[in-house]
Design a protein with these regions (language model features):
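Transmembrane-lumen/periplasm boundary regions of multi-pass, lipid-linked membrane glycan transferases
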Residues: 228-298
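Membrane-interface alpha helices of multi-pass inner-membrane proteins
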Residues: 184-201, 207-213, 241
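Transmembrane-helix motifs of polytopic, lipid-linked glycan transferases
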Residues: 41, 112-132, 169
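Loop-to-helix entry region of an early transmembrane alpha helix in multi-pass inner-membrane enzymes
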Residues: 90, 94, 103-120
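Membrane-interface transmembrane helices that cradle and orient dolichyl/undecaprenyl
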Residues: 136, 170-188, 215-222, 291-298
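Transmembrane-helix signature of polytopic, membrane-embedded enzymes
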Residues: 36-38, 125-147, 164-165, 183-184, ...
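Short acidic/glycine- and proline-prone juxtamembrane loop motifs at membrane-interface regions
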Residues: 155-163
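Perimembrane helix-loop-helix junctions
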Residues: 206-240
């Protein structure tokens, strides 16, 4: 932030932020072709090298084995919740089904797909970092994203590999409430959030936060209360649209009870873990994140 203050010392914080966002948006378009290909190659290589010990290993993690089984059986006409049970959303199994349809053997198919999502997340994070730092530092942040995602459970094809990039995309779209197309970008962000919900429902709080931030922007833009209520309803409808669509599908085929129980009831019937939600060793495990957070605030 000190760099922003030096460049725009005469403006308010809001003006400085808006100017920095505009500067990031005005990155030369040619950089998205030749000039940025090296970046995609670098991040892809970094992701492959870091994840190499796990690629091709069926036992890299246990959850994906079930996701892959259900996804592959979807191609044979079987359905999640009705024929094969798990509490994860339909969209996650669809992703694994698409990976299986690629023709690559499991686990290569879904692990390489997850690697692609990791690279996309790194690119999105770099885009966010460019609002505050130079290109080199932003690239380091993108590489650090790949490292941390690998260390903290997304070394194979856990759900975070897929829905974290969606959250980063939402942040990019709604971050600038003064953007001339802020509302249009917010509509798109809410749809992305809805798709992320179909990967894992635990992204709901983040989606609500981004929706409220976008709504605050409309309030600052002078929208009336009735307009804000209508916009909020539209945000909610777009965010729930993918899940509603899946629910209507199961209702049409007579599988509504199975869908409802798996998605919205079974979670509350889970037995608590013996160690509790947070084990004692987690404190040490998250210390690197605390250090990075403090450094970032500085």
């Amino acid at each position: 932030m000190r760099g922003i203050v030096r460049n725009h010392g005469g403006g308010t914080v809001g003006q400085m932020t808006a100017m920095s966002l505009d500067r990031a948006d005005s990155t030369p378009k040619s950089g998205a072709s030749r000039g940025e290909l090296w970046l995609v190659a670098l991040l892809t290589l970094g992701a492959l090298v870091l994840r190499l010990p796990f690629l091709g290993d069926h036992n890299a993690d246990i959850d994906e084995q079930l996701y892959a089984l259900i996804g592959s059986q979807m191609l044979q006409g079987q359905l999640p919740f009705v024929d094969l049970w798990d509490r994860k959303p339909f969209g996650l199994f669809l992703l694994f089904g698409l990976a299986d349809a690629s023709g690559l053997p499991a686990p290569w198919s879904y692990q390489l797909m997850a690697t692609g999502f990791i690279v996309i997340g790194a690119l999105l994070l770099r885009r966010l970092a460019l609002l505050l730092v130079d290109r080199g530092t932003a690239t380091v942040a993108a590489l650090l994203y790949i490292v941390l995602m690998t260390i903290y459970g997304s070394h194979s094809a856990q759900t975070e590999a897929f829905h974290v990039p969606a959250m980063l995309a939402m942040a990019l779209l709604v971050r600038d409430i003064r953007h001339p197309n802020a509302l249009r970008r917010a509509w798109f962000a809410m749809l992305i959030g809805g798709l992320a919900l179909q990967v894992k429902y635990t992204v709901f709080p983040q989606c609500v936060f981004f929706g409220l931030w976008a709504l605050w922007g409309r309030y600052r833009a002078g929208r009336t209360l009735s307009q804000l209520v209508a916009i909020a309803a539209g945000f909610a409808a777009l965010g729930l649209l993918p899940t509603i669509g899946v629910g209507l599908f199961y209702l049409a085929i007579g599988g509504w009870e199975e869908f409802w129980f798996a998605n919205f009831v079974s979670f509350f019937l889970r037995a608590p873990a013996p160690m509790g939600r947070f084990a004692d060793q987690y404190t040490i495990f998250v210390m690197p994140l605390v250090v990075l957070t403090v450094a970032g605030l500085y």
